[in-house]
């Protein structure tokens, strides 16, 4: 039994791409890192990336990043917990994160 996934919901699953030194080094292996919503599943993330960027995804690895303490004035709080997805693309496919550069 297959589940029909709404295209608008798929677009909302991807929060932002991660552009750190470690994530940039993974671009050489055709791997892209994204912050995704915590309730997103691997098949949904795969469908969202394929729909938004018109590429073929060969693998998705996910990890829940821990909450971090954040000081706001004299009060201590927490930054929200996020889920991070490392998406591996088919050889030859690529995502243009910075179209003007």
Curated annotation (Swiss-Prot):
Keywords: Ribonucleoprotein, Ribosomal protein, RNA-binding, rRNA-binding. InterPro entries: Nucleotide-bd_a/b_plait_sf, Ribosomal_uL23-like, Ribosomal_uL23/eL15/eS24_sf, Ribosomal_uL23_CS. Pfam families: Ribosomal_L23. It comes from the Bacteria. The keyword rRNA-binding applies. NCBIfam families: PRK05738.2-4, PRK05738.3-4. Part of the 50S ribosomal subunit. Contacts protein L29, and trigger factor when it is bound to the ribosome. This is Large ribosomal subunit protein uL23. It comes from Synechocystis sp. (strain ATCC 27184 / PCC 6803 / Kazusa). The gene is rplW.
